[in-house]
Amino acid sequence: FCVILLICAIPYTIVAQHQNILIDAVGNPEEPSIYINPTNTNQMVAGANINKVYYSQDAGKTWTKGKLESTYGVWGDPVILCDTAGAFYFFHLSYGKGSEGWLDRIVCQKMEDFADKTWSDGSYMGNSLLKDHDKEWIVNDPRNNAIYSTWTVFDKYDSKKASDSSYIYFSKSLDGGVTWT
């Protein structure tokens, strides 16, 4: 009985496999995030550390590669989102100026035209040179297109002191990522 069951299962196992597509191997991309446009499922955007962005317009069969830039700096932890209007967002850590300025805020960059692939310089939430902002995550409410973000703010990153704390922050945007409350 077990042999017959195994023989019958083999063809279905082979047919059920999906093609694994390697998007990029240069620089060992890590911490990937990917999102499919809910209004056009052929359009996909992916991000990887530190500033890599990838585009597919054929439902992930082929990809093109880009590099994200911002005057706020781009320092990894990508989170990709697409709103109900089809605009893509790339959230990431900042790389502020000065030795103590890195991770001083969470940056939101927006791409409204998939064909053009131009990203805004970005808006941001947080902004504290004395604390480290990290571990952001984003969701979109499809009923009103609001964007919600949470992230962690550390008094001192990796500190073991009892006097140093970490806090979970929350922010929302009701205007497509232009401003944050």
Functional labels for PLM-detected ranges:
Residues F1-H18:
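Bacterial Sec-dependent N-terminal signal peptides
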